[in-house]
Amino acid sequence: MKCCVNGRRAQREEMMEKDKAGSMKDRILYESLKLFADNGYAAVSTRMIAKAVEASDAVIYKHFKSKREILDTILEQCKRRYLAKRNTVRIATMCWDEVESICMDMFSFQTQDEWIVLYRKLLVVEQYKDPQMAVLYRKMFIEGPLESLAGMFRILIEQGYMKKGNPMVYAMELYAPFFLFHTVGGESEELLQNLEEHVRLFRENVRES
């Protein structure tokens, strides 16, 4: 009986240690992302990261082999976070009336989700120094959204909801102001109203009569 109790206690302690380790790893990633976005990757040292999470350098290296591994993990996690949200849009089954809500929902996500805001800021800062960052930025915030919208419009054209035209050109027209205000930052009630009006006018202009 005593062995069973000790065994369960050991399991609980092991689980608690794993939770602590996971929590510290997440803190390291988040604080590193903030530092990289504000200062640039090259300007941030592991000592700065350790100070931000109130730990020693040894704790950082316990979870990550190098500063580069921290960056790579951040990039992968943010990419998964972004794509998970984007993939909630079921293009093949969506209807014409959902265009406005989809656009506004994605805009709010990209301007309010702290990880994504910092991720974009990091890519903007680093795109001129690292070709990989430039490619990521284009794919995640320019090419990806345009391709998704074009795919959506292609289906809506086939279904007879939209006038026949170039789906990619339609996508560029709709996405342009959203991209502009992503880069500027900030979100006001007036801006949201203007963007909603932009989507409504776009829908009216391209609706098949």
Name each model-derived stretch:
Residues 73, 86-118, 168-174:
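Hydrophobic alpha-helical connector segments
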Residues 98, 111-136, 183:
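Amphipathic alpha-helical segments used for helix-helix packing
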Residues 112, 131-158:
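Amphipathic alpha-helical packing segments from all-alpha helical-bundle domains
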Residues 150, 164-175, 196:
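Short, well-structured alpha-helical segments
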Residues 42-43, 159-166:
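Short, charged helix-capping/linker segments at alpha-helix termini
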Residues 27, 31-69, 73-74:
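Helix-turn-helix
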